[in-house]
């Protein structure tokens, strides 16, 4: 495949279309700010609105159209911008629903993200009758083979190792796959999946449409775009376009760290009006807080990276279904949680780096869905909060007494 427009330029040693600091320049200016104007199938539109989307996010306004038109697309966007739905909608629009063959393949760096993408695709494609299978490690290979052989799902989403394995053993046929999506490409490459990704490309048709999404654009990501993409459309969603819109942000002054627990317990009634996610900075603290809350007879569930896959799945299932209402977790899993009903996020600890702030609270009010974020702030935290306000050009106000009315 020709590398398209990414030839190296002399000025700053980076590929053309790149600024020196690893940010791509957009070469596509068309913006469609309404799902109704995208010429989507009626059944897909129903799925989009039923899912709770009202208007497209910045990346959706820009990237859905070129994806649907069949262009190769590179989109630089953080998580929390609505990128999953961007490629989910693009895939679903291009599906031939009566063709019972796999027509799109999506790669993601982690099992959680792959399962999350699968859920979004199934929800958006619900009225179309689209089928989607998650092909991930940590599950039974034999079951997977039987599943893929029994009926080919329209869409396969998975982690590179397992997807390559299924292609290699010919349980997953590349014959009808016309769209290949790499989500969080920077993450996949930094986790050492480069060889598998290259091998997967070798097994796919040479004129396949490639859509690559990445928060950052390091050399190894650019190498993939240069090698496997043809004259790609480049779309950059800048930080300030990440949405804090519609999210009311508050802080509560908590004089001392040890008083946070009582503050949280006082808020508990408010939390359970809907569903809430509480973020802490360490796994140990997640366990500690969960125990303390249980000891006081509050119902909460906890999720962190030390738990095994089965346990994590059960907890997420309970939370998604609404049978558990308060989830305590760490940043590690912030990216894997996108639950419709979450309209309240509590930062028990402020995030250690400011980028994570949007990953956490971007959950609460995505895409026109409103949300409330409450930050617990000690004396030492005030500087961090000011830093966050400056970084996102936003204001965090003291929490009013009637916060329950806002949720």
Swiss-Prot record:
Catalytic activity, reaction form: ATP + H2O = ADP + phosphate + H(+)
Residue span of motif DEAD box: 183-186
PROSITE patterns: DEAD_ATP_HELICASE (PS00039), HELICASE_ATP_BIND_1 (PS51192), HELICASE_CTER (PS51194), Q_MOTIF (PS51195)
Helicase ATP-binding domain location: 64-235
Renumbered ranges of motif Q motif: 33-61
Family matches, as SMART domains: DEXDc, HELICc
Region annotated Disordered, chain positions: 1-23
EC number: 3.6.4.13
UniProt keyword list: ATP-binding, Helicase, Hydrolase, Initiation factor, Nucleotide-binding, Protein biosynthesis, RNA-binding
Subunit details: eIF4F is a multi-subunit complex, the composition of which varies with external and internal environmental conditions. It is composed of at least EIF4A, EIF4E and EIF4G1/EIFFG3. Interacts with EIF4E.
Protein function: ATP-dependent RNA helicase which is a subunit of the eIF4F complex involved in cap recognition and is required for mRNA binding to ribosome. In the current model of translation initiation, eIF4A unwinds RNA secondary structures in the 5'-UTR of mRNAs which is necessary to allow efficient binding of the small ribosomal subunit, and subsequent scanning for the initiator codon.
PANTHER family per the UniProt record, alphabetical: ATP-DEPENDENT RNA HELICASE DBP3
Protein name as catalogued: Eukaryotic initiation factor 4A-II
Species in which this protein is naturally found: Gallus gallus (Chicken)
